[in-house]
């Protein structure tokens, strides 16, 4: 599951945000634009560093860009192109090893020049990680919808889809309407599992993003 909680702008709804996260019952939950005041009861959690060193005036001391919460033990962490914006852990699951790459592609949205740079760097990470032979799950804020004209750049969309196709990765949330937070998983990890997709925060009251979860059966 993944959700961008909008830098906890709506911290008066912290209890509801925590409840929404818990209700997913996700074995792997990636939060983006997140905050250490969101404390979830998982045996393992991994976080990009606080952002106050980058821009102390702009960010709260409790803010970070990506957090991964999981019920699975971590074998090791992998280096990414930008340790503040992308986080990769290798987990031991009941279906074998899985690399989870939690990310924000383009922290200022897809219209800012940094989006393309971020996209190129992160797709390079994904190519290198795919070459390791371990199945991959890319999960987070892609700043790109795929099923409609909600929010996307043509180049960004095509580049992501081409890379996923080249590396046998399925974008499971591709057909979700007005959805820019996504979950993409190596086809060999999905195998012949049934897929069920659920969303929450459709009214955007708790943050300006919907949350999305994928359940394998």
Regions found by a protein language model. Name each.
Residues 1-46, 58-63:
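N-terminal, active-site-proximal structural segment of metallo-dependent hydrolase catalytic domains
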Residues 1-2, 6-19, 66-217:
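Active-site regions of metal-assisted phosphoester/phosphodiester hydrolases
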Residues 50-58:
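Short, acidic/turn-prone active-site loops that include or flank metal/cofactor-
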């Amino acid at each position: 599951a993944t959700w961008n909680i909008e830098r906890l702008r709506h911290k008066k709804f912290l209890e509801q945000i925590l409840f929404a996260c818990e209700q997913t019952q996700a074995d792997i939950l990636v939060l983006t634009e997140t905050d250490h005041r969101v404390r979830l009861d998982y045996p393992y959690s991994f976080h990009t560093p606080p952002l106050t060193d980058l821009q102390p005036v702009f960010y709260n001391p409790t803010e970070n860009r990506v957090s991964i919460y999981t019920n699975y033990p971590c074998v090791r962490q992998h280096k990414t192109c930008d340790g503040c914006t992308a986080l990769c852990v290798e987990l031991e699951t009941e279906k074998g090893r899985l690399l989870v790459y939690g990310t924000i592609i383009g922290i200022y949205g897809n219209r800012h020049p940094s989006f393309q740079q971020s996209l190129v760097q992160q797709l390079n990470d994904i190519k290198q990680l795919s070459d390791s032979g371990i199945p991959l799950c890319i999960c987070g804020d892609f700043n790109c919808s795929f099923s409609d004209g909600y929010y996307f750049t043509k180049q960004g969309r095509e580049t992501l889809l081409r890379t996923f196709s080249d590396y046998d990765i399925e974008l499971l949330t591709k057909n979700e309407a007005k959805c820019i937070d996504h979950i993409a998983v190596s086809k060999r990890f999905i195998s012949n599992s049934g897929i069920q997709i659920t969303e929450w925060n459709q009214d955007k009251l708790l943050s300006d993003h919907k949350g999305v979860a994928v359940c394998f059966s």
